[in-house]
Amino acid sequence: MLSRGKRLGYAAYERLLQWELSGTPDHVAVIMDGNRRYAEKQGTKKQEGHKEGAQTTEALLNWCDELGIREVTLYTFSTENFDRDPEEREHIFDLVEQKLRTFADADRVHEAGVCIRAIGETEMLPERVRDAIDYAEGRTAQYDQLNLNIALAYGGRAELLGAARDVAAAVENETLDPTDVSAETIEERLYEGPTRDVDLIVRTGGDERTSNFLPWHANGNEAATFFCTPYWPEFRKVDFLRAIRTYQNREDSWRTTRAERSLALVRAIEQSELPTAKRMLGRFRDALPSTEREQLDEEYDLAD
């Protein structure tokens, strides 16, 4: 239990972080790690760690709704998790089934326009979990304000391997010309789920690795990553805001780099190409350091 002073400090820091944010990612993927280690630290059963982790998941969805994030993907159960103790595994399945049905019926889910979808090799899951998936997807299929993708029986390598096999089979059957294979060809054969590339990956629990989560949507987009030490049940809104700040800092750095490269390009091109280059540079003008921005305005008259 935190002291009153610490609670006030966290609240103030949380407000400061939120005030400093100038933008949020469209798609956040979360690796919710540390439920079992949290339970061990607390001296309780693993099941209690998973229950408390589920409460953090509900809080996360509220934060995403508040901040206007459009898509969230939760790494809930990997294909490797099938190797866990049967009792723990069944408890996780019970919890997933319960939460899927609860979310699907929750007023706040319908008010916020949340569309729930499962991604992964769901045919490997128990029938009761598959039924709960069908129920949740059916109840929320009409919404598009916030896409909630729940990764169940998911493995990044398996997803890419399945897509590659489908492409190979199509080529062998002569329904696909090898010269027509493109990024879109692969993407069409991935698990049906994410509608956007991942902007930010968050992992709790102290491990600094992405566990091959959403490799096509995250690695291909060079998503920002945020690793933090709190176990998933300990994850707070202030931690989430710090993660978003990491994304924001990366975006700001990217824009500055693009702006500086555009400026170098403008200075190097021929006069006949200058109008096109100036339009491109104008898009990134505000990302330049103030001294370079002033010099740019003077040289090329880009200021409003």
UniProtKB/Swiss-Prot annotation:
Keywords: Magnesium, Metal-binding, Transferase. Its EC number is 2.5.1.89. One of its GO terms (biological process) is polyprenol biosynthetic process. The active site is at residues 33, 81. It is an enzyme of class 2 (transferase). Mg(2+) binds at residue 33. It catalyses: geranylgeranyl diphosphate + 7 isopentenyl diphosphate = tri-trans,hepta-cis-undecaprenyl diphosphate + 7 diphosphate. Its cofactor is Mg(2+). The gene is uppS. InterPro entries: UPP_synth-like, UPP_synth-like_CS, UPP_synth-like_sf. It comes from the Archaea. Substrate binds at residues 34-37, 46, 50, 78-80, 82, 84, 203, 209-211. SUPFAM superfamilies: Undecaprenyl diphosphate synthase (SSF64005). PANTHER family: DEHYDRODOLICHYL DIPHOSPHATE SYNTHASE COMPLEX SUBUNIT DHDDS, DEHYDRODOLICHYL DIPHOSPHATE SYNTHASE FAMILY MEMBER. Binds 2 magnesium ions per subunit. Catalyzes the sequential condensation of isopentenyl diphosphate (IPP) with geranylgeranyl diphosphate (GGPP) to yield (2Z,6Z,10Z,14Z,18Z,22Z,26Z,30E,34E,38E)-undecaprenyl diphosphate (tritrans,heptacis-UPP). It is probably the precursor of glycosyl carrier lipids. Belongs to the UPP synthase family. GO terms for molecular function: ditrans,polycis-polyprenyl diphosphate synthase [(2E,6E)-farnesyl diphosphate specific] activity; magnesium ion binding. This is Tritrans,polycis-undecaprenyl-diphosphate synthase (geranylgeranyl-diphosphate specific). Homodimer. HAMAP family: ISPT (MF_01139).
